[in-house]
């Protein structure tokens, strides 16, 4: 029985573009995410 390939193929540029700070700040919901993580005291706000 053949298994598929691994689904996580790390790529720093894509990671930043999809989950990065500038991307988060573009939308209201994204700003809410960053704000919630600030309030919670997260060491890292975004990827």
From Swiss-Prot:
Q: List the disulfide bonds.
A: none
> Does the keyword field hold Ribosomal protein?
yes
Which GO annotations describe the biological process of this protein?
Answer: translation
The cross-references to Pfam families, in alphabetical order and at most eight, read: Ribosomal_L34
Per UniProt, the keywords (alphabetical) are: Ribonucleoprotein, Ribosomal protein
Q: Name one GO cellular component term.
A: ribonucleoprotein complex
* Coiled coil (residue ranges): none
| One example GO MF annotation | structural constituent of ribosome
N-terminal signal peptide: none
Has keyword Ribosomal protein?
yes
State the similarity comment: Belongs to the bacterial ribosomal protein bL34 family.
Q: Which NCBIfam families match?
A: rpmH_bact
By its UniProt entry, which PANTHER family does this protein fall under? LARGE RIBOSOMAL SUBUNIT PROTEIN BL34M, MITOCHONDRIAL RIBOSOMAL PROTEIN 34 FAMILY MEMBER
What protein name applies here?
Large ribosomal subunit protein bL34
Q: Which organism is it from?
A: Corynebacterium jeikeium (strain K411)
